[in-house]
Protein backbone atom coordinates (compact mmCIF):
# COMPACT_ATOMS: atom_id res chain seq x y z
CA UNK A 1 0.00 0.00 0.00
CA UNK A 2 1.36 3.37 -0.99
CA UNK A 3 1.75 5.91 1.79
CA UNK A 4 0.69 9.45 1.04
CA UNK A 5 0.96 12.66 2.93
CA UNK A 6 -2.18 14.38 4.14
CA UNK A 7 -2.01 17.00 1.38
CA UNK A 8 -1.64 14.49 -1.45
CA UNK A 9 -4.37 12.34 0.07
CA UNK A 10 -6.69 15.36 0.15
CA UNK A 11 -5.92 16.05 -3.51
CA UNK A 12 -6.72 12.45 -4.48
CA UNK A 13 -9.99 12.57 -2.54
CA UNK A 14 -10.89 15.88 -4.18
CA UNK A 15 -10.12 14.50 -7.65
CA UNK A 16 -12.21 11.36 -7.12
CA UNK A 17 -15.03 13.37 -5.58
CA UNK A 18 -14.99 15.66 -8.61
CA UNK A 19 -15.44 12.68 -10.91
CA UNK A 20 -18.44 11.30 -9.08
CA UNK A 21 -20.02 14.47 -7.68
CA UNK A 22 -19.12 17.38 -9.98
CA UNK A 23 -21.71 19.74 -8.49
CA UNK A 24 -20.28 19.47 -4.99
CA UNK A 25 -16.78 20.43 -6.19
CA UNK A 26 -18.09 23.42 -8.15
CA UNK A 27 -19.85 24.84 -5.13
CA UNK A 28 -16.73 24.39 -3.03
CA UNK A 29 -16.77 25.10 0.65
CA UNK A 30 -17.99 28.65 0.27
CA UNK A 31 -21.27 29.35 1.98
CA UNK A 32 -23.75 31.74 0.47
CA UNK A 33 -24.48 34.85 2.43
CA UNK A 34 -27.78 34.94 4.20
CA UNK A 35 -29.77 38.05 3.51
CA UNK A 36 -30.71 39.85 6.65
CA UNK A 37 -33.47 42.40 6.55
CA UNK A 38 -32.84 45.63 8.33
CA UNK A 39 -35.15 46.56 11.16
CA UNK A 40 -34.70 50.29 10.74
CA UNK A 41 -37.89 52.22 11.40
CA UNK A 42 -37.74 53.99 8.03
CA UNK A 43 -37.61 50.67 6.18
CA UNK A 44 -40.42 49.31 8.34
CA UNK A 45 -42.61 52.23 7.31
CA UNK A 46 -41.82 51.64 3.63
CA UNK A 47 -42.61 47.94 3.99
CA UNK A 48 -45.89 48.68 5.77
CA UNK A 49 -46.87 51.15 3.06
CA UNK A 50 -46.04 48.65 0.29
CA UNK A 51 -47.95 45.90 2.11
CA UNK A 52 -51.00 48.17 2.43
CA UNK A 53 -50.84 49.02 -1.29
CA UNK A 54 -50.59 45.33 -2.17
CA UNK A 55 -53.52 44.56 0.15
CA UNK A 56 -55.69 47.20 -1.56
CA UNK A 57 -54.73 45.83 -4.98
CA UNK A 58 -55.54 42.22 -4.06
CA UNK A 59 -58.83 43.19 -2.41
CA UNK A 60 -59.90 45.17 -5.47
CA UNK A 61 -59.08 42.18 -7.72
CA UNK A 62 -61.02 39.85 -5.46
CA UNK A 63 -64.03 42.17 -5.34
CA UNK A 64 -64.15 42.25 -9.15
CA UNK A 65 -64.26 38.46 -9.34
CA UNK A 66 -67.59 37.38 -7.95
CA UNK A 67 -67.56 33.62 -7.33
CA UNK A 68 -70.19 31.67 -9.27
CA UNK A 69 -70.54 29.15 -6.48
CA UNK A 70 -70.75 30.54 -2.91
CA UNK A 71 -69.19 27.33 -1.53
CA UNK A 72 -65.97 27.95 -3.47
CA UNK A 73 -63.03 29.81 -1.92
CA UNK A 74 -60.52 31.75 -4.00
CA UNK A 75 -56.90 30.99 -2.98
CA UNK A 76 -53.68 32.45 -4.43
CA UNK A 77 -50.75 30.10 -5.05
CA UNK A 78 -47.43 31.02 -6.63
CA UNK A 79 -47.52 27.95 -8.88
CA UNK A 80 -51.04 28.32 -10.29
CA UNK A 81 -52.09 31.89 -9.44
CA UNK A 82 -55.68 32.24 -8.19
CA UNK A 83 -57.38 28.87 -7.66
CA UNK A 84 -60.95 28.20 -6.59
CA UNK A 85 -61.35 25.38 -4.08
CA UNK A 86 -64.03 24.14 -1.73
CA UNK A 87 -63.86 23.81 2.05
CA UNK A 88 -62.98 20.10 1.87
CA UNK A 89 -59.85 20.70 -0.24
CA UNK A 90 -58.85 23.95 1.49
CA UNK A 91 -56.41 22.08 3.76
CA UNK A 92 -54.10 21.36 0.81
CA UNK A 93 -53.12 25.03 0.66
CA UNK A 94 -51.01 26.51 3.44
CA UNK A 95 -51.30 30.12 4.51
CA UNK A 96 -48.04 31.93 5.28
CA UNK A 97 -47.98 35.49 6.50
Swiss-Prot record:
One Pfam family cited in the UniProt record for this chain: LtuB
Domain of life (superkingdom): Bacteria
The protein, known as: Late transcription unit B protein
Native source organism of the sequence: Chlamydia muridarum (strain MoPn / Nigg)
Lineage: Bacteria, Pseudomonadati, Chlamydiota, Chlamydiia, Chlamydiales
Gene coding for it: ltuB
Amino acid sequence: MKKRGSRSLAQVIRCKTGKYFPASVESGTKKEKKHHYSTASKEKEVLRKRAAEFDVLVRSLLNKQMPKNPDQILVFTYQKGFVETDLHNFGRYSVKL
